[in-house]
Amino acid sequence: MILPILKGLALTLNRFFSKPITIQYPEEKVPPAKRWRGIQYFEKDERGKTKCVACGLCMAVCPSQCIYIETAEDEEGRRYPLTYELDATRCIFCGFCEEACPVGAIFMGKNYEWVEPERKPYIMTTEKLLEEKKNNP
């Protein structure tokens, strides 16, 4: 009866002096894995506007159908997204939208800290997707 107690005590003492596995999350942060897919963001072109040409491929390839696009043309005849909405509550973060984009406008970010008390902030518009670039160096 005393032998199992001594074995358990020896194991406890052995682990007591080893490096802790736990991190103190809010103060310490683990960098995401190389292939981590967080919330999406848009890249800007040389004019400072979104690179998106509103081709609709991301909307067509999305398995959860969380992307909605309305297109328009500017005075130079270039297409742009008049309305681009990404519903992050429906998104499964598969990365198909990033792969399908022919101009490299949308990217999967590294941001994994995104908590809001209401659902409305999870509807990402063009402006919010351009802003999200700041959270993804």
Which residue ranges define each predicted feature?
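Non-ligating segments of multi-cofactor redox enzymes
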Residues: 1-85, 89-90, 99, 103-137
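Basic, alpha-helical nucleic-acid-binding regions used in initiation and control of genome expression
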Residues: 94
